[in-house]
């Protein structure tokens, strides 16, 4: 069993960590792999070549660092390509899904917004998975039950669609406690991706385990909603307070903002 993490950004796009730093901090957490998803629009061919080469150079018998991209689409939808390394020219999400799939990579709609659910359900081309918990977008305390319900409806059409659980790591002061436990005996990137695609994993956060199927008891989904609502209320209070300070011309120190990112 390998411990790892999904959905991270480096200084190749808008992250604060270098690839070497990411390897070091996740190794220190007892992880064996990390799936990168730097933003595709930051790259040209020379930089994507450097990115892939550096990821490969940081793979060894202790750790697998897997290059991948996050594609920005119409209506601010984001689609992760775990193992994808070719930028795209289209902003149509279904074209992007096909583009990712053509690379034998894993296509995952990242942190889908509530108002995009109906649109996603109308897609003719569906992704390999839905990111049902993104601890940057949803918060560290609980995901939205509605994202799991979206996945459940899509699974009527695509039974092998998976639930993915990502950190969306950007900042040095950010929560990093959601991990992916992978039933895999190899650190080869291709093998790790194959095990992810086959759903041979579960998410782990403290004592909570969440399956790759995304099928959860109704009681747990209800608890998620209550916890998420409480966290959201606290976050909105702080956001409104910051907005008031901004209007008064008072700048919130970066150290305080960094601490808030870690808490939420």
Which residue stretches match the model-derived regions?
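Short, flexible loop segments at the rims of nucleotide/cofactor-binding pockets, characterized by
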Residues: 10-14, 44, 84-88, 108-109, ...
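Charged catalytic cores and adjacent phosphate/nucleic-acid-binding surfaces used
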Residues: 1-6, 19, 23, 75-86, ...
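An N-terminally biased module of ancient metal coordination in phosphate/nucleic-acid-related enzymes
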Residues: 1-74, 254-264
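Conserved beta-strand positions in the central sheet of alpha/beta enzyme cores
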Residues: 35-36, 108-109, 131
């Amino acid at each position: 069993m390998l411990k790892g993490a999904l959905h991270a950004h480096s200084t190749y796009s808008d992250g604060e960590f270098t690839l070497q730093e990411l390897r070091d901090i996740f190794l220190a957490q007892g992880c064996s792999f990390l799936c990168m998803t730097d933003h595709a629009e930051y790259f040209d061919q020379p930089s994507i070549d450097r990115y892939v080469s550096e990821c490969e150079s940081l793979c060894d018998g202790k750790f697998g660092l897997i290059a991948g991209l996050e594609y920005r689409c119409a209506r601010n939808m984001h689609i992760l390509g775990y193992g994808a390394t070719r930028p795209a020219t289209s902003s149509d999400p279904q074209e992007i899904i096909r583009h990712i799939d053509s690379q034998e990579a894993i296509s995952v709609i990242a942190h889908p917004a509530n108002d995009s659910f109906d649109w996603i359900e109308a897609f003719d081309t569906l992704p390999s998975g839905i990111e049902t918990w993104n601890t940057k977008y949803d918060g560290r305390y609980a995901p939205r039950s509605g994202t799991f319900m979206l996945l459940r409806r899509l699974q009527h059409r695509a039974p092998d669609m998976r639930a993915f659980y990502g950190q969306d790591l950007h900042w040095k002061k950010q929560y990093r406690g959601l991990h992916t436990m992978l039933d895999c005996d190899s650190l080869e990137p291709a093998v790790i991706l194959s095990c992810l695609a086959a759903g041979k994993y579960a998410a782990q956060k403290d004592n909570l385990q969440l399956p790759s199927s995304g099928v959860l008891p109704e009681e747990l989904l209800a608890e998620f909603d209550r916890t998420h609502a409480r966290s959201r209320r606290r976050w909105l209070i702080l956001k409104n307070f910051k907005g008031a300070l901004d209007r008064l011309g008072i700048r919130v120190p970066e150290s305080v903002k960094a601490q808030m990112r870690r808490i939420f």
